[in-house]
Amino acid sequence: MERGSKVKILRKESYWYQEIGTVAAIDKSGIKYPVLVRFEKVNYNNVNTNSFADTELINLGK
């Protein structure tokens, strides 16, 4: 997984569950949710990004 990769969200409580987003950044410092994902649509707070753990994502490639 790298910046620009398409990913599918597996976190059930997420607004974007089962949606496809694009990896915007990956933090290598050891935090719990290091992968920042950007989406086409916004959530109820008008936000289009969220952080996820590697285990909550399926990498679909570029």
From Swiss-Prot:
Electron transport in keyword set: no
GO-annotated cellular components: chloroplast thylakoid membrane; photosystem I reaction center
Record has Chloroplast as a keyword: yes
Single GO BP term: photosynthesis
Membrane topology: Peripheral membrane protein
Keywords: Chloroplast, Membrane, Photosynthesis, Photosystem I, Plastid, Thylakoid
Main location: plastid
Subcellular location: Plastid, Chloroplast thylakoid membrane
Protein family according to the UniProt entry: Belongs to the PsaE family.
Annotated function: Stabilizes the interaction between PsaC and the PSI core, assists the docking of the ferredoxin to PSI and interacts with ferredoxin-NADP oxidoreductase.
Protein name in the entry: Photosystem I reaction center subunit IV
Organism: Pyropia yezoensis
Gene field: psaE
